Amino acid sequence: MNRRRGILFALASVLLVSVAQLSMRWSMTRLPRPDQWLSVPSVDSVALAVVLAAIFAYALSMLCWLAALRDLPLGRAYSLLSISYALVYLLAASLPLFNESFSFSKSLGVALVMLGVITINTRPARAPELRSSP
């Protein structure tokens, strides 16, 4: 197990899934409902391309996640996924094209999530105990 490599793959997964989520949000505010994509005469091709790119980013994120699971204990790896919730909230609220707003309660929630991620990932990992056969 290579912890550093596992963390890098997990963070790459977080980054890709966050970009995918923001891209889908941007696209879906510019497109009709998905069931109307084939019947509407003019669908925004850029927004549709961004949706497809976001789906590809999700697939890459999953591959990075699988690679991370090879090198990290599940409890540590899974906690790193929480960073995506914080990242998406912060970017959506700070970038004008998303028209989202900051709130004290949401920001406090993000801070608590990040504190939890830091707490889980800064304490030393215990080696698994081997059980002897009876």
Curated annotation (Swiss-Prot):
An example GO BP is: lipid A biosynthetic process
List residues in topological domain: Periplasmic.
27-45, 99-101
Q: Which InterPro entries match?
A: Flippase_ArnF (IPR022832), Small_drug/metabolite_transptr (IPR000390)
Q: What SUPFAM superfamilies would the database entry show? A: Multidrug resistance efflux transporter EmrE
Q: Where in the cell?
A: Cell inner membrane
- Its domain of life? Bacteria
Q: Does the keyword rRNA-binding apply?
A: no
Recorded GO cellular component terms are:
plasma membrane
Q: Which GO terms describe its molecular function?
A: carbohydrate derivative transmembrane transporter activity
Q: Where does the sequence pass through the membrane?
A: 6-26, 46-66, 78-98, 102-122
Which residues lie toward the Cytoplasmic compartment?
A: 1-5, 67-77, 123-134
Record membrane topology: Multi-pass membrane protein
Q: Annotated pathway, please?
A: Bacterial outer membrane biogenesis; lipopolysaccharide biosynthesis
Q: Which UniProt keywords apply?
A: Cell inner membrane, Cell membrane, Lipid A biosynthesis, Lipid biosynthesis, Lipid metabolism, Lipopolysaccharide biosynthesis, Membrane, Transmembrane, Transmembrane helix, Transport
State the protein's purpose: Translocates 4-amino-4-deoxy-L-arabinose-phosphoundecaprenol (alpha-L-Ara4N-phosphoundecaprenol) from the cytoplasmic to the periplasmic side of the inner membrane.
Family note:
Belongs to the ArnF family.
Q: How does it assemble?
A: Heterodimer of ArnE and ArnF.
Question: What is the name of this protein?
Answer: Probable 4-amino-4-deoxy-L-arabinose-phosphoundecaprenol flippase subunit ArnF
Its source organism is: Pseudomonas fluorescens (strain Pf0-1)
Mind giving the lineage of the organism this protein is from?
Bacteria, Pseudomonadati, Pseudomonadota, Gammaproteobacteria, Pseudomonadales
